[in-house]
């Protein structure tokens, strides 16, 4: 059983690696065990972590945002028993390779490009030049010893992206602007990563959106 509500990909890898070691030890009669850091160590770090830097960051990012970025202005979708419709688009090998090369040339990654592309989509369907949406973070990058911990660390936090300097495609400056926007998005994500353990409720309180 694997689900992000109880674990993440790295946890699954640690478990499978441990199983492989156990099987190997039975064959070779050796002890290759690796010490695992208790998950409670992460909980203690999270509880004792000062939040003033997180609060200052999210206030600077979100205090002027007073309306959620709701696609087509739809804020609440009724929950029904029907299976939601899904649309999938597979990026084939050649295009995937081109995307990796293009983003690497700008010192970024395809993940940064997809964040920027989604921001552009939201901006168009919401009629806004600044959007905010959730970005899923691993939660392990700023946690000492996390590479040896089993458990869930994933956190989803709001990312703000400005589209004011992003001209329409086909214009003479579009290419340069995409590169500039990609770099700006990379910087935004890098800053957000340094606050990846901040509670989502704290980020919400720092925005100008009224509580429901």
Question: Where are the language model's segments positioned?
Answer:
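Aromatic/hydrophobic pocket-lining residues that form π-stacking "cages" and hydrophobic walls in ligand
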Residues: 99
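His-Asp-centered acyl/peptidyl-transfer active-site segments
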Residues: 47-55, 85, 102-115, 124-212
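Short amphipathic alpha-helices and their capping loops
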Residues: 17, 21, 35-87, 94, ...
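Soluble acyl-CoA-dependent acyltransferase catalytic core bearing the H(X)4D motif
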Residues: 62-68, 91, 102-104, 137-138
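Short amphipathic alpha-helical segments
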Residues: 11-17, 110-118
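Generic detection of short hydrophobic beta-strand segments and adjacent strand-loop junctions
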Residues: 28-29, 70, 87-91, 159-161
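Active-site-proximal acidic secondary-structure segment that organizes catalysis
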Residues: 1-38, 123, 134
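Short, hydrophobic secondary-structure boundary micro-motifs
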Residues: 30-34, 68-73, 132-135, 200-203
């Amino acid at each position: 059983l694997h689900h992000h509500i109880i674990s993440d990909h790295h946890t699954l890898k640690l478990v499978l690696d441990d199983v492989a070691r156990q099987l190997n030890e039975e064959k070779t009669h050796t002890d290759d065990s690796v010490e695992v850091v208790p998950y409670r160590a992460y909980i203690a770090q999270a509880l004792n972590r000062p939040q003033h830097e997180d609060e200052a960051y999210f206030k600077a990012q979100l205090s002027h945002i007073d309306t959620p970025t709701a696609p087509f202005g739809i804020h609440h979708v009724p929950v029904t028993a029907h299976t939601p419709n899904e649309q999938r688009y597979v990026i084939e090998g050649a295009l995937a390779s081109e995307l990796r090369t293009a983003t690497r040339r700008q010192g970024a990654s395809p993940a940064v490009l997809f964040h920027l592309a989604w921001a552009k989509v939201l901006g168009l369907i919401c009629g806004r030049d600044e959007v905010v949406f959730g970005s899923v973070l691993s939660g392990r990058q700023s946690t000492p010893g996390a590479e040896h911990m089993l458990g869930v660390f994933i956190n989803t936090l709001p990312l703000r992206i400005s589209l004011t300097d992003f001209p329409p495609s086909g214009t003479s400056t579009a290419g340069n602007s995409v590169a500039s926007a990609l770099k700006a998005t990379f910087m935004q994500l890098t800053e957000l990563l340094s606050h990846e353990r901040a509670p989502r409720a704290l980020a919400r309180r720092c925005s100008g959106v009224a509580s429901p």
